[in-house]
Design a protein with these regions (language model features):
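Primarily marks hydrophobic transmembrane alpha-helices of the MFS/SLC 12-helix fold
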Residues: 72-75, 79
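Pair of pore-lining "gating" transmembrane helices in MFS-fold secondary transporters
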Residues: 2-29, 107, 211-227
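Cytoplasmic helix-loop-helix junction between adjacent transmembrane helices
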Residues: 105-143
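Helix-loop-helix hairpin linking two adjacent transmembrane segments in secondary transporters
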Residues: 140-194
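Central cavity-lining transmembrane alpha-helices of secondary-active solute carriers
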Residues: 46-64
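Juxtamembrane intracellular "pre-TM" segments in multi-pass secondary transporters
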Residues: 1-4, 193-216
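Short hydrophobic/small-residue motifs within alpha-helical transmembrane segments
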Residues: 51-53, 146-147, 220
Length: 227
């Protein structure tokens, strides 16, 4: 089947839905985790911190390794890593001590989410705009996080009511279907430009010398704290 840039846009939009799943699903299980696994409130707070810190670390570290591969490869990897983390969240706590199992899962899906942050924006910006500004396309893509967040919270909450809190592990399995599907899509969709070549004129050290970057980093830290 012939793909066009509409399929690429849809894959980018769905990538932000994946991010919404990764960030918002586990907190819906906090009460369940306390009841079933007897985890502490400090552990749940640490889990939120791990999710945020890993995403920030991947955002920064990607400046180094993104030069050694392609955006397609990273897009596929980000989706499958997110899916793997969600699958492990459903399976690992049943097979080993729950606290390290949940942390391992969070490390994986947070890595995938952080990598998506780095990859999806350049991808959507590179696509032909068909008369619309690239800023409008970027804003639309980011709006899919909000739609995804609303869907994750609503569907998961209703599902927990229907199937019972003891069957919570079915939900990560269900939501993992989205990044699995999207990872497969990213293996097929066309890229607008040759994205094997990247500008590395600033480098990681150069970024930290820019006041704008430090300001945005501070805002992201504050946003993570508010979560």
């Amino acid at each position: 089947m012939t793909q066009n840039f509409k399929s690429t846009r849809r894959a980018c939009y769905t990538g932000y839905v994946t991010q919404a799943v990764v960030v918002n699903l586990a907190p819906l299980f906090f009460v369940t985790f306390q009841n079933e696994f007897k985890v502490s409130l400090s552990f749940l707070a640490a889990l939120t911190l791990v999710t945020f810190v890993v995403q920030i670390f991947i955002d920064v570290a990607a400046v180094k390794f993104i030069e050694k591969t392609t955006y397609r490869t990273l897009a596929v990897f980000s989706q499958f890593t997110s899916a793997a983390g969600l699958l492990l969240l459903a399976i690992l706590p049943k097979l080993m001590a729950p606290e390290p199992a949940i942390i391992i899962s969070a490390l994986l899906y947070s890595s995938g989410s952080g990598l998506s942050e780095v990859v999806l924006s350049p991808l959507i910006e590179s696509l032909p705009t068909e008369g619309k500004s690239s800023g409008a396309a970027m804003s639309l893509m980011h709006s899919f996080y909000s739609w995804g967040q609303a869907a994750v919270i609503l569907i998961s909450t209703l599902s927990l009511k229907l199937i019972g809190g003891d069957n919570w592990f079915f939900l990560p399995l269900f939501w993992a279907l989205i990044p699995v599907y999207n990872g497969l899509m990213f293996t097929r969709v066309p890229m607008a430009v040759d994205m094997d070549v990247h500008d590395n004129s600033h480098g990681l050290g150069g970024l930290f010398k820019q006041k704008e970057f430090l300001f945005v980093l501070l805002i992201m830290i504050c946003a993570g704290a508010s979560e």
